[in-house]
Amino acid sequence: MTIAFGRFIKEENDLFDIMDDWLRRDRFVFVGWSGLLLFPCAYFALGGWFTGTTFVTSWYTHGLASSYLEGCNFLTAAVSTPANSLAHSLLLLWGPEAQGDFTRWCQLGGLWTFVALHGAFGLIGFMLRQFELARSVQLRPYNAIAFSAPIAVFVSVFLIYPLGQSGWFFAPSFGVAAIFRFILFFQGFHNWTLNPFHMMGVAGVLGAALLCAIHGATVENTLFEDGDGANTFRAFNPTQAEETYSMVTANRFWSQIFGVAFSNKRWLHFFMLFVPVTGLWMSAIGVVGLALNLRAYDFVSQEIRAAEDPEFETFYTKNILLNEGIRAWMAAQDQPHENLIFPEEVLPRGNAL
């Protein structure tokens, strides 16, 4: 029998292989094929946001000051959404609205669509980066799957919701106080806190925080060696030879506390993955529903009885009145181009007034 020794010589001028070798090379900051999407999009999204919050006014779109140049601070500066009249235009710099004029493009709100679209693709690129690295080091892709949850929330809130409404104008602007205003808008116009998908989202996020705190404390509790002095801070000693974390000890502890406890590390950590990811996905689904103007729970019988009986009021009916007040105030303030005027007699008031 003849055995031939040698190696397969690949075509040295294969551009794909040259690119693949350079992109996936082991270096301090991994680039990868996903980096071709991630790094440019993240750079443009962050650069657009810093540029907008520093220099660009919202006077022409919202009648507001929104930049450091105009006197805003970190909490009040924002990259604001385009004007309502521009509907769902992509607001390309070379498009019919700005016609290549950068100053006009900024005044019309072009930076918002620029940041939103590059931000969305940047987040997707980051998820693909986790897929790519997991495949390279032979890990399962649960990190990327988990990161799909914040991507779903971003896309549903910043893109799908305004697509279901009359324009990008009704999306959140990119700023701290601007996001708070958007939350108030969601409550007043959609009664978001009474939406079951919001409830599932809150349960997921707060439940995940609770699980994270419990898990971290339990691991720290059982990390240092038994019988070596009950000093909490020994858990932070970096010179310990090996990990002494005991799943059995943790299981016995929580069995005594709650009567039940996780007995399997895989199930425990899957549950910690499942709770926040499912909560965020449910929130995203709920926001898609709001884009279509689907309503939350309505307890009409309580509203009718409150209207008929001055002595009957519930927390629900009080919240409905509060929502009416938000709408009456915010519609006129938030959409000055509509010239909305609400006479005193239509403004909401509680039964006590």
Swiss-Prot record:
GO terms for biological process: photosynthetic electron transport in photosystem II. Fe cation binds at residues 215, 269. It comes from the Eukaryota. The modification N-acetylthreonine is found at residue 2. GO terms for cellular component: chloroplast thylakoid membrane; photosystem II. Its EC number is 1.10.3.9. It holds the Pfam family Photo_RC. Belongs to the reaction center PufL/M/PsbA/D family. This is Photosystem II D2 protein. It comes from Phalaenopsis aphrodite subsp. formosana.
